């Protein structure tokens, strides 16, 4: 069972971490396995049971007592040498009372029958120093701070609205915390190991419309003081927009694209104009499924995505 590998990968430094396992009325062995670990490691593992309609991120944060927070799905795991480096780094920052909002690491895909692939940020972030947004080099196209690469200060994560659908915890965690992240540190180790590709379902197209609107209205992008910060946010929104429109095209909902554009343009004309100037901007008025399909192929390769019915 993949869950064993995920939990075991957290226990090497069990005296310095808390492992919160959230079970939302699973119908398999999840709860039983989780309870066994809680019994074996009562000082480290805590099992939380909740209803299916309660966002797991919200309930986990309510129970979290750690200074920093990381999300790990049951089919992923943590690289062991990297775990030691991460804990030692955080311990050092706590010792010197440094204010660190976000720790970023590399991550890798370890998918059966496929070549291992590491994603590195060494050409983007300064190394061996705390830095802020203005210290970051220019972002490459398709660059994203991935959920698997982040360890966020718990108090920072608690500032955002965690009532969104569970399927969007990735976007909520990474995008939602941007206004509150001032200080960062990059650790050049492949900490998070993805054991599978991330899937995007065409049947969820309307949910992605809601996500796009939610992210768009979440905060005022132009209130962000750093130009690098604003640039990153617009690039992030561009990616979500392209995926949303592609799903609407594939599900034959072109009228929803027009309604989405009206919403975005009306609620933030300046941001909408900036979005249209991006690499994907020429697509916004075209609704050309073939062109969107080409971009999705790029995303699938860069982000290891799978588009499914």
Residue map of PLM features:
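Donor-binding/catalytic cores of nucleotide-activated saccharide
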Residues: 77-183, 199-203
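Membrane-interface aromatic/basic loop that binds lipid-linked glycans or pyrophosphate carriers
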Residues: 252-309
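Glycine-rich, basic loop-to-helix element that forms the pyrophosphate-binding segment
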Residues: 49-65, 74
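Conserved short acidic donor-positioning loop in nucleotide-sugar-dependent glycosyltransferases
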Residues: 10, 24-25, 51
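Catalytic core of nucleotide-sugar-dependent glycosyltransferases
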Residues: 189-198, 202-228, 240-269
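Short, acidic, metal-binding catalytic loop of nucleotide-sugar glycosyltransferases
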Residues: 8-17
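A conserved acidic beta->alpha catalytic loop
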Residues: 23-32
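Short aromatic/hydrophobic "clamp" motif used to bind/position activated sugar donors
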Residues: 69
């Amino acid at each position: 069972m993949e869950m064993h590998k995920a939990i075991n990968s957290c226990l090497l430094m069990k005296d310095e971490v808390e492992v919160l396992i959230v079970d939302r009325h699973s119908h398999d062995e999840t709860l039983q396995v989780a309870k066994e670990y809680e019994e074996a490691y009562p000082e480290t593992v805590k099992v939380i049971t909740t209803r299916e309609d309660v966002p797991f991120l919200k309930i986990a944060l309510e129970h979290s007592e750690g200074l920093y927070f990381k999300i790990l799905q049951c089919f992923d795991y943590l690289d062991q040498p990297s775990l030691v480096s991460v804990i030692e780094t955080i311990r050092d920052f706590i010792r010197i009372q440094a204010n660190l909002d976000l720790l970023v690491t590399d991550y890798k895909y370890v998918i059966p029958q496929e070549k291992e692939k590491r994603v590195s940020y060494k050409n983007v972030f300064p190394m061996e120093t705390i830095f802020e947004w203005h210290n970051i080099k220019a972002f490459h196209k398709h660059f994203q701070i991935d959920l698997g690469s982040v360890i966020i200060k718990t108090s920072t994560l608690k500032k955002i609205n965690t009532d969104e659908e569970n399927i969007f915890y990735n976007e909520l965690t990474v995008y939602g915390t941007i206004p509150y992240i001032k200080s960062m540190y990059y650790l050049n180790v492949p900490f998070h190991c993805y054991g599978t590709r991330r899937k995007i379902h065409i049947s969820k197209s309307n949910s992605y419309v809601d996500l796009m609107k939610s992210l768009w209205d979440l905060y005022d992008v132009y209130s962000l003081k750093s130009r690098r910060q604003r640039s990153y946010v617009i690039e992030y929104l561009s990616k979500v927009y392209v995926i949303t429109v592609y799903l609407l095209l594939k599900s034959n909902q072109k009228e929803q694209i027009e309604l989405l554009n009206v919403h975005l343009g009306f609620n933030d004309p300046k941001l909408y104009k900036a979005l249209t100037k991006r690499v994907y901007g020429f697509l916004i008025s075209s609704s050309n499924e073939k062109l969107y399909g080409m971009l999705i192929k790029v995303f699938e390769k860069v982000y290891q995505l799978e588009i499914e019915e």
